[in-house]
Amino acid sequence: MKVRLVPLYFAEANDRERQEFADQMVRLKEFYGDVAEFLPEVCVGDPIPEADAILFPQLIFAAFRHNDELTGYKLPMVVLTSRFGTVEMWDWEIVTYLRDLGCTVFSPYNIDMAKVILRAIAIKRTLKG
């Protein structure tokens, strides 16, 4: 069973950031395709399809401007922003901010940890029935 991830992006992203987002999605599909199903990308604030978790392949400053939208999703969030398929070290500030808002945020620092987290989120769906 694969975890269903819905990647979120920010409308405020510039052209360079949009390309980096697309490049990161390619990498993440390579790293995690064996444990994750990647749903279509959704802009922060828009409705999301049925999913197990939210994926942030990129975090930008705009995250600080979307409190209501982000807290409204009620799904765990996984931050995989580095080119190595883990969390970028400077994203800790946004991760901490999201946690302070009450979001459940996972920011794995290696691929093995990320896969354990993703598998656990997928299993949760099975256990709920």
What is each PLM-predicted segment?
Residues 1-129:
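An N-terminal assembly and electron-transfer interface module characteristic of large anaerobic redox
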